[in-house]
A protein has these predicted regions:
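Ligand/cofactor-recognition surfaces for anionic moieties
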Residues: 1-208
Length: 208
């Protein structure tokens, strides 16, 4: 999550396996392109995710809806979604696609009631205590869908990375630096990391 990778989901509303196959191919093409210039700290993630999406179809992971899940970062999600939107517009995908994500994601809603020792009811948070949240966004090949992809996915991922960077997680700090370089309009205040010895000495002085 520190690097922005999380469970990106999509559903082909046509219900056609052929449309899901097309989305798999488009997602793989995006990941292949990203790997050409990817920094070392996320290269392994991209390689694993590329292997996953290439193998997903032959492993028959679909149960019911023609849907897929793929771990992807902000750039990956946005580029994949835009590729889907273009494919819908030109007819390679026959119907709209619904984008979403897991409730437990980079920018997912905190769940103060999550059961961390055992899960008895399958929900993970206890009966009646669910305060998680996700989203579903329909893309239909339109320019308006393209705008929503750019704005919604950008905010959804980078909001979480910023929060994690403020916790001084090295991966998140590097990820948000990279995003600010890629998106000049984004300005996130970076944390100041104090030397452990300075903090230790200050605490010792307070106690004495």
């Amino acid at each position: 999550f520190d690097y922005g990778f999380g469970p990106f989901r999509w559903v082909c509303t046509s219900g056609r396996a052929e449309d899901l196959d097309t989305t798999d191919r488009l997602a793989a093409e995006v990941l292949e392109e990203m790997l050409r210039t990817a920094p070392d700290d996320i290269r392994g993630q991209l390689e694993d995710n590329l292997h996953w999406i290439r193998e997903a179809g032959r492993n028959r992971l679909v149960v019911g809806s023609q849907a897929r899940i793929l771990y992807a970062d902000c750039e990956g999600r946005t580029r994949i979604a835009q590729a889907f939107n273009r494919a819908i517009a030109d007819g390679r995908i026959s119907a709209p696609v619904v984008l979403g994500r897991d409730h437990h994601d980079v920018s997912g809603t905190d769940s103060p009631y999550r059961e961390t020792v055992s899960i008895h009811n399958g929900g993970g948070v206890g009966w009646g205590e669910v305060v998680n949240g996700g989203f579903g966004m329909v893309i239909d090949g339109s320019e308006e869908s393209g705008r929503r992809i750019r704005e919604m996915l950008f905010w959804d991922v980078n909001n979480g990375i910023a929060r994690r960077s403020w916790a001084r997680n090295d991966g998140a700090v590097e990820a948000i630096r990279r995003e600010m370089a890629r998106t000049p309009g984004l300005q996130v205040t970076l944390p100041n990391s104090a030397d452990d010895n300075v903090i230790r000495n200050a605490l010792n002085e307070t106690e004495s």
